Amino acid sequence: MAIFGVKVADRPAVQLNIGQAGTAITSARAAVQAGCAETDARIEAKITPTETDYLRQLGYSVTAIRLCDEAMRLLLRVQGGNGLREGSSFERRYRDFQAMPLHINAHPDRVAELVGKHLLGVENNAPFQ
């Protein structure tokens, strides 16, 4: 596809945004893989997770979601108005993705508060169970 005779892939802003989105997705994947590796190792060693373990796992997932959100926003920027007007499935997927972190287990405000309290040694009124 070309706009004003220049291929979209040849535009520096497209390259920049795609590059940043790719890096964000790679980092999100690394966070998830690190969390899964920790969980697998704990299961293999038959170690019951502590509150610290639980909160670190929540942190991995919230970080991965945040990085994927950043990637989605960058890809939306690349699509621009023409991409949205042409009606690909991206807009629906973007909207659906926005609902994901609103679920209580992945809600960034909830997780950040719990992790912050734990790191500061403040009593948590919703203790790990």
Segments from the language model and where they lie:
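C-terminal helix-coil-helix/basic helical segment that borders enzyme active sites and/or dimer interfaces
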Residues: S27-V62, R73-L84
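A structural signal for alpha-helical segments
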Residues: V6-A9, A13-L16, T23, A45-G59, ...
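Generic structural signal for well-ordered, non-transmembrane alpha-helical segments
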Residues: G19-T26, L58, V62-D69, R95-Q98, ...
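Extended amphipathic alpha-helical segments enriched in small hydrophobics
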Residues: M1-R42
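Glycine-rich phosphate/cofactor-binding loops in nucleotide/flavin-utilizing enzymes
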Residues: N82-Q129
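Short linear motifs at secondary-structure transitions and domain/linker junctions
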Residues: A2, E51-T52, P127
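A generic alpha-helix surface/boundary motif
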Residues: P12, D69-E70
